[in-house]
Structure formats: C-alpha cells, structure tokens
C-alpha cells in the first residue's frame, strides 16, 4: 500500500485539489485538515509503514486459567469482523483507519466527510489496487458515499 501511495501521490494530490476548490467554508482549521499535500501524503505512507511494523494483534493470549472443574479458559484477541467509522473531512483517516482495521483482520466501512469525497474515493481506489495486487478481494475496505439521511438509514438497518 505504501508503494501505491507513493506511485499515485500526484493523483491523490490532484483529487484533493478538487476538494479544496469546492470547499465553500471559511473554517481555516477544517481546510487545513482537508488538505492533502505532499507532506500529508508522506505522512500517510509513514502511517502505513508504522502499522505494518506492529506485531500481529490476532491470536494474542490475554489470560488463561483452568477452572476447578477442569475446564480450561483462554482469552485471545480476535477480529470483530466488520467495523464502520464515520469521520470528518480528513483524507489521512481513510488510510490510517483502513490500515489498522486490515492489520487486525477486520473489514472496514468508511464514511468520510463530504468535503473530502474526491480524495477519499482516490484513496479507496489505492486500497483496492493494493488488495487486488495481493490476491485479496476489495470488500475488505468499502467506502460509503452517503448523505446524512442515507447514513442514518444504514445505521438503523445495517444490511
């Protein structure tokens, strides 16, 4: 994934420029969080590498005991299955959240702020490319391009 982010760096920045051009607010802090320049893409690459270097979180024993009746109880870490994250317009979260979810064996449903739609879709495209190149299905990482009402409907009935 880090290699793909590097290869697609200019396309990521170009997609982000579309988001920045369409940004209609005067909230400087939000604009700064939305911005994905060369430095921010470098940070995304570094975050992928940092997660890669972490120990595998799956199957670690948390505790283990034998009950007096002989039953053995072992508590091990395991994936949740599928998680969803709803976040503001910060394209780097698309990379960081998906990295952590994938590393921990979870599928992830991403819903970023509407202001970062072009950036997020490009970053999810990068994820799908990385998954495909490694013989995995793209359903590990999915992006919901939903408005507020459709998001709330999904949360009421997540099918």
Residue ranges and their predicted role:
Residues 53, 61-159:
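Rossmann-like NAD(P) dinucleotide-binding subdomain of oxidoreductase/dehydrogenase enzymes
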């Amino acid at each position: 994934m880090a290699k793909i982010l590097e290869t697609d760096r200019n396309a990521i920045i170009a997609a982000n420029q579309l988001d920045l051009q369409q940004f209609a607010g005067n909230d400087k802090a939000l604009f700064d969080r939305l911005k994905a320049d060369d430095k921010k893409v470098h940070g995304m690459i570094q975050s992928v590498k940092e997660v890669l270097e972490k120990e595998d979180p799956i199957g670690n024993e948390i505790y283990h005991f034998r009950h007096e009746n002989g039953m053995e109880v072992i508590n091990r870490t395991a994936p949740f299955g599928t998680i969803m994250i709803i976040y503001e317009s910060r394209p780097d979260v698309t990379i960081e959240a998906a990295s952590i979810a994938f590393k921990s064996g979870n599928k992830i449903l991403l819903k970023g702020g509407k202001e970062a739609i072009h950036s997020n879709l490009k970053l999810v495209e990068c994820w799908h490319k990385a998954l495909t190149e490694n013989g995995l299905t793209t359903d590990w990482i999915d992006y919901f391009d939903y408005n507020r009402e459709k998001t709330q409907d999904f949360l009421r009935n997540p099918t």
